[in-house]
Amino acid sequence: MYTTNNRRYIGIAGTIAAGKSTLAKQLSDYWHVPLIKEPISPYLADFYADNKEYAFRMQVYMMASRVKGSLILSRFGGIQDRTIYEDRIFQKVLCDRGDMEQRDYETCSLLYKSLSKPSPDVVIYLKVKPETSIQRQKDRARVKEIGIDEGYMEHLVMAYNTWASQFTGNLITLHWDNPLSVEEVAEQIESFYDN
């Protein structure tokens, strides 16, 4: 069973609207441990309105915010909604699509390599089909997400799957088109720690 004495640092990964925030909150409540929510960037609405103009600023802000969260959780344990690894996925997709200049991508790469970024003990990857992610994003209808291109969402899902297949850390992949209960997820995480 998870206890605060264990100081476990668990990251929840997945594309936009995969269900990360919901699961992160459920696990935090289930185990009564700290939760670092995904930061809401002051650039978010601007970014979705004009990817090219705001991509670099958005990505630098998100990396800095996530590192701050990882430093806290590496010391005290808890759950992190989206990990810094995922910032690299977003940056590559933006560069591949021409929404981030190569020099900005290289600057993000340099910054990423330079940051002190404690790693989660385990990352839970919520794998969804592109159509699931797109539908969930539409269903939640967040004002700041208006303007997300479906092609961008599809590209992100493919990039996440590639990342997961190459990830060298501890990864538990959950097929999240049909979410499990928090108890079922907690059982899988506890089983990971017991082995």
Q: What label would you give each PLM region?
A:
Residues 12:
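Hydrophobic anchor at the beta1->P-loop junction of P-loop NTPases
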Residues 20:
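Conserved lysine of the Walker
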Residues 29-68:
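Conserved substrate/cofactor phosphate-moiety recognition/catalytic segment
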Residues 134-195:
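NTP-dependent small-molecule kinase module
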Residues 15:
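P-loop (Walker A) phosphate-binding loop of NTP-binding proteins
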Residues 54-118:
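Glycine-rich phosphate-binding loop used to anchor ATP phosphates in small-molecule kinases
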Residues 23, 27:
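Hydrophobic positions on the alpha1 helix immediately C-terminal to the Walker A/P-loop
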